[in-house]
Amino acid sequence: MKQRVKQLAITEKSVKKKKIVAVVIIMFIFSIIILGVGSKLVFQKICERRETAWPDLGTADDEQYEWLTEAYKIKQKNNEKIVILASDGTKLEGHYYERKKNAPLVIFFHGFRGHSYVDGVPIYKIAQKEKWNVLLVSMRAHDESEGNIFTLGVKERYDCVDWGNWAAKHFGRETPIFLMGISMGGAVVTMSSNLDFPDSVCGIIDDCGFTTSTKMLELNCKSSLPKGMPV
């Protein structure tokens, strides 16, 4: 009798252990699913294309008004629309402003969810003053360029090479070419620096590019997701 009771007790313990293991496994699988879905939602929130309208002009007495009116003026100036195919087949577009034939060329890459005209106001003015030519590029998944997702430099760095190759072929190997980017664009041109460019690509200018994609994602998660949601 005692032996039978002992066996029943052992059996009950075994069943309890199996239940605990089953619960742990289910919770683990559930956590993985939640993590996967959450990661996808965060990625979509940050990196998916948005058909962002141009910012409102604001009022005539603020700094934004002056900046955006300059951007609108640049957009309306005479320029040549350039379309290239990236190495993965994505159509990329930019606008070329010629100040002087055979002058050095600056290929400009805008910032995170930015606009080439808006972010490009300072370099356009400098190029006009120095009599350089400038190409304002719309990065993938922004404005006129194709793509549903941008990758914070993972793919965009190769787009820099494609733009450099196009410029070297179009303007000739004797034309000095510089890549310049601001914010995310700055990080992109820096990330491209170890890739194979034509010899006419002479330099890279990084204006306040982020240091790591991880920090960039963390910053945008905090500003884009609901308050209290862990990042």
Regions found by a protein language model. Name each.
Residues 127-146:
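Conserved alpha/beta-hydrolase
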Residues 87-98:
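A short loop-to-beta-strand scaffold at the N-terminal edge of the catalytic core in hydrolase folds
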Residues 103-111:
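Short beta-strand element of the alpha/beta-hydrolase
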Residues 112-125, 139:
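The serine-hydrolase catalytic nucleophile loop
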Residues 171-183:
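Alpha/beta-hydrolase fold nucleophile elbow
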Residues 150-171:
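Alpha/beta-hydrolase active-site loop
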Residues 191-231:
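Hydrolase active-site cap/lid region
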Residues 27-84:
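An N-terminal hydrophobic leader/cap segment in hydrolases
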